Amino acid sequence: MKTNDGKSVDVGKVWWFWFSSNAFAVDKRLRRLFRMLPHDPRCKFCNAPFQGVGGIVVRALFGKQRSDLNPLFCNLCEMASREFPGGAEVEMSMLFADVRGSTALSKKMRPTEFSQLINRFYSGSTNLISKEDGLVEKLAGDAVAAFWGAGFAGPNYVRRTIKVAQNLSNVMARQGIPVGIGVHSGVAFFGAVGTADGLTNISAIGDEVNTAARLASKAAAGEIIVSEQALKAADIDGSELESRSLELKGISEPVLVRVMRGKQ
């Protein structure tokens, strides 16, 4: 395809290098810098804050502000996603976490109390994910999804994903929030997907992503279900952890997993 200035570009290579290569270390440093600035809400992609003192700083120094077309992104990230529609198949790790028994909890609590619980879950999750250079893919209902790649988190990105899972399990347990977590790794499509009217989202899709989500659905409160595939990629010996063979919807073969419970 051609960019807006008429230059030819291989979109797949752009997304692959951005997500998988350390060539974009400056982007990683900026994401960390933006995360240190107050205040939420933020750009889903670069962590630039939209409001408060942090919002004023990034508007003045970087020209970033909330996009008029997509409130999840800053104007510059949204523009880049439209300029490079498409993506690439990349190696990544995925974390899905959700509040177990949320329907029953919502019936026991006042709406305001339940909303505060979910907000604590969102806040704790996003802080831990961002500190380990993960991309928060979505916050929806009672669930959080995030992804890691070498371009963001370095060669130990799978190990960092598992670290977040352990820390998140511990933090939520201390707050009395019952959370189950699934971690997996593999190849998925990562890039900008959009609609005919120009609205874009930056996401990861594919069978491996679906597997991670289904692992989370099998995790009881306080459990972290990690696929053997992810443990191998992280070079972690899981031989002393509980082993399970799970039948997952849409997956023809049983998936071998290990079960963690907070920090090991």
Language-model segments: residues:
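Alpha-helix/helix-capping structural signal
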Residues: R100, V187-A188, N210, Q229
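Catalytic NTP-binding/metal-coordinating core of nucleotidyl cyclase/transferase enzymes
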Residues: P85-K163
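Amphipathic alpha-helical regulatory segments at dimerization interfaces
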Residues: R32, A80, G124-L128, N167-R174, ...
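Cytosolic regulatory/linker segments at or just downstream of nucleotide-handling modules
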Residues: K218-Q264
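Regulatory cytosolic signal-relay segments
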Residues: M1-V90
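Long C-terminal interaction/binding lobes of large macromolecular proteins
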Residues: A25, R35, P49, P155, ...
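A conserved hydrophobic position in a structured secondary element of the catalytic/binding core
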Residues: A97, S185, V226
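Catalytic core of nucleotidyl cyclases, primarily class III adenylyl/guanylyl cyclases
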Residues: T126-R160, V171-D207, V255-R258
